[in-house]
Regions:
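A short, Lys/Arg-rich alpha-helix, primarily the initiator
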Residues: 3, 7-42, 52
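Positions in alpha-helical segments
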Residues: 34, 58-61, 73
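Short, Lys/Arg-enriched C-terminal cap helix and immediately downstream tail that follows
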Residues: 39, 72-73
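Short alpha-helical DNA-recognition segment
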Residues: 41-65, 81
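Residue-level "edge-of-site" marker
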Residues: 63, 76, 91-92
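DNA major-groove recognition helix of helix-turn-helix/homeodomain DNA-binding modules
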Residues: 73-88
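Short amphipathic recognition helices of helix-turn-helix/homeodomain-type DNA-binding modules
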Residues: 88-99
Length: 99
């Protein structure tokens, strides 16, 4: 049975996005990590923010330190949580506004 509305595990609709679950990030992972840390802000711990995003504290720490490449699923969750564009999260360009 084919579902016409594909969704990620956390129920965010893909809306026609045809990209592998892991994207090729050409930007500096440390810079991406700094932007993820900026989105988390000072009011949430890594454990709390990880629960919101559906990842563990250790994995979130790896993303923030630039030791792990963020998945498309994580980028979509960051966008949904923060309203920041995926372009800004990945490249730092295009402003942090909504897409």
């Amino acid at each position: 049975m084919r579902n016409s509305s594909r969704r990620l595990k956390n129920n965010i609709p893909l809306k026609g996005i045809h990209i592998k679950r892991h994207i090729q990030v050409r930007s500096d992972l440390k810079a991406i990590g700094r932007r993820i840390r900026e989105i988390r802000g000072f009011d949430l711990t890594q454990a709390e923010f990880g629960r919101i995003l559906g990842v563990g504290q250790t994995q979130l720490s790896k993303y923030e330190m630039g030791h792990s490449e963020p998945t498309l699923e994580l980028l979509l969750r960051l966008r949904a949580h923060s309203g920041r564009s995926i372009d800004w999260i990945v490249t730092g360009e295009g402003g942090p506004g909504k897409t």
